[in-house]
A protein has these predicted regions:
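N-terminal secretory/targeting leader peptides
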Residues: 2-19, 23-121, 129-132, 136-338
Length: 338
């Protein structure tokens, strides 16, 4: 029987575990978990990945070795999910919008503007039936979801102040790929541009794109604020990550090792989500202190104008993500999704 590339990668991953445990001296050959992500080590996700490494290696007494590859050093964000499915990497932490190309468009509902009022509301929602239901959408793709990690709320920037919806007219704004984000920026009159995270700084610097949206920690660690004259602290949409693993690899782990790794992940998740807000506040303070950009804050009336401009995205979203996930969100948040 000829194996596909995906089957081959998964077989190799599971086989490596069996080999490590099936021969004398396996302790000298720890199980390797490669964790690839696209942001810096000193962001909430970066620190969370390092915390998982620390705890997983501690709890398994060295039976597991976690190799963390930040800043797209192993795979770019548009490559990493296929690499996970092929078994070339075992763990990722992509933004949830990255699952739409797999057929799991429902995750994009989390990108709706003004959906979560704060980090606590987001965290509570994802710990409930909504988070479980969404992860089940990945199982048929050979992927298991382990945790949701918070990264705070988006700001948006350009080389001019973005105060009123009309200020967005004709601007090329980089987005990560979410069709929901694409829609709400189009509702504001801009032209969304999908681009790998590792390419954004140069694109901003050279004018390939006019602006972008992201969280304060990502702006600061990637130095986006150094090549954007103005940033609006709008907090118009939430950015969340899902920590996922190659299902065959994870299920092939010995039960005791898997349990210890899951304990490490649970604790790393609590840690990551507990520091996200503080990390973003500190990053925003550093951006302000740098003097390299001007920060703008919306008045209540200006915020309402943005909300009204982006509101058509909600009606459109039902055709994109389906009514079931919107109903789940409405129930979880006790809000009307219209």
């Amino acid at each position: 029987m000829k194996l596909s590339r995906r089957q081959f990668g998964m077989t190799i991953g599971a086989g490596a575990i069996a080999a490590a445990y099936g021969r004398p001296g396996w302790a000298q050959q720890p199980i390797i978990i490669k964790y690839s992500h696209v942001v810096a080590n000193d962001t909430p996700k970066g620190k969370g990945a390092l915390k998982f490494k620390e705890l997983a290696e501690k709890y398994t007494n060295g039976k597991v070795k976690v190799e963390v590859y930040p800043n797209s050093t192993l795979y770019k964000d548009k490559e990493e999910i296929e690499a996970l499915q092929l078994g070339s990497v075992q763990m990722l932490g992509p933004s949830t919008a990255k699952f739409a190309p797999l057929g799991a468009k429902e995750f994009e509902a989390l990108d709706l503007p003004w959906l979560f009022k704060d980090d606590e509301t987001y965290g509570s929602a994802m710990k409930g039936p909504l988070g479980t239901w969404l992860f089940k959408k990945l199982e048929s793709k050979g992927i298991l979801g382990l945790a949701y990690w918070d990264n705070g709320f988006h700001m948006v920037s350009a080389n001019k102040p973005l105060i009123n919806p009309s200020d967005f007219q004709g601007l090329k704004i980089r987005i990560s790929g979410s069709k929901i984000a694409d829609r709400y920026f189009r509702d504001m009159g801009s032209i969304p541009q999908i681009m790998a995270f590792s390419e954004v700084y140069q694109a901003l610097q050279t004018g390939v794109v006019d602006g972008c949206e992201n969280t304060p920690s990502n702006y600061f660690t990637q130095k986006f604020h150094e090549v954007q004259k103005d940033i609006t602290v709008s907090y118009h949409a939430h950015l969340q990550y899902a920590v996922i693993v190659n299902a065959k690899f994870w299920k092939a782990l010995p039960a005791d090792v898997r349990g210890q790794a899951e304990k490490a992940m649970n604790e790393a998740t609590d840690y990551t989500n507990s520091i996200a807000q503080k990390e973003n506040e500190e990053a925003l303070a550093e951006i302000k202190k740098s003097g390299k950009t001007t920060l703008h804050y919306l008045t209540d009336a200006q915020k309402v104008a943005w909300q009204n401009a982006m509101h058509p995205t909600y009606a459109w979203a039902k055709s994109r993500v389906g009514g079931e996930v919107l109903d789940l969100i409405a129930k979880e948040l006790n809000v009307k999704m219209n």
